[in-house]
């Protein structure tokens, strides 16, 4: 789970006057020092491999968070080391419950599939990457800045 704290008005108004006592008073990003909870920014599910039951767990975890949230929908992501593109696609090309699937060794997976995989595996892997449904783990911190 990745969360963030609410921000004081001084920080929000640092570069331009955006909020005061009359504007934006209900936004959860504003620190009102009344013991408000942290803001849920992202949920990252880590699955070493993706058998069908594990893939379904990641999807149902995401749906439960979305249904029970208050406020905006957090980023919902999966990190995996799954070596087969077909299993990765069960999540990456799913119903849109997840923002993205991240592979901890995507360059190595691409090289292995290019060297030893069949044409269908290569095409599936390329489709997930070009469609921005599968990314390398190095992209994850950058994607979390948004």
Can you annotate each of these PLM segments?
Residues 5, 48-49, 81:
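Histidine- and/or cysteine-centered catalytic micro-motif in compact active-site loops
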Residues 1-2, 40-46, 58:
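Conserved catalytic cores of phosphodiester-cleaving nucleases, focusing on short active-site segments
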Residues 3-4, 12-38:
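Active-site-proximal segments of catalytic enzyme domains
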Residues 63-66:
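A short, acidic, amphipathic alpha-helical segment used as a generic capping/interface helix at domain edges
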Residues 68-146:
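C-terminal tail/extension regions appended to the core domain(s) of diverse proteins
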Residues 9-15, 49-61, 72, 86-89:
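Active-site-adjacent loop/helix micro-motif of nuclease/hydrolase catalytic cores
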Residues 2-5, 105-107:
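Short loop/turn segments at strand-loop or loop-helix junctions that form parts
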Residues 39-43, 70-73:
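Short, surface-exposed connector motifs at secondary-structure boundaries
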């Amino acid at each position: 789970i990745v969360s963030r704290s609410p921000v004081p008005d001084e920080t929000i108004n640092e570069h331009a006057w955006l909020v005061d006592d009359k504007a934006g008073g209900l936004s959860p990003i504003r620190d009102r020092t009344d013991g408000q909870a942290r803001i849920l920014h992202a949920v990252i599910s880590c699955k070493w491999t993706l058998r069908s039951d594990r893939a379904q767990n990641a999807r149902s975890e995401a749906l439960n968070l979305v249904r029970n949230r208050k406020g905006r929908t957090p980023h919902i992501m999966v990190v995996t080391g799954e070596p087969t593109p077909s299993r990765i696609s069960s999540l990456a090309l799913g119903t849109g419950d997840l923002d993205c699937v991240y592979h901890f060794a995507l360059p190595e997976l691409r090289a292995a599939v290019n060297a030893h995989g069949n044409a269908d595996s290569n095409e599936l892997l390329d489709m997930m990457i070009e469609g921005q449904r599968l990314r390398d783990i190095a992209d994850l911190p950058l994607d979390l800045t948004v």
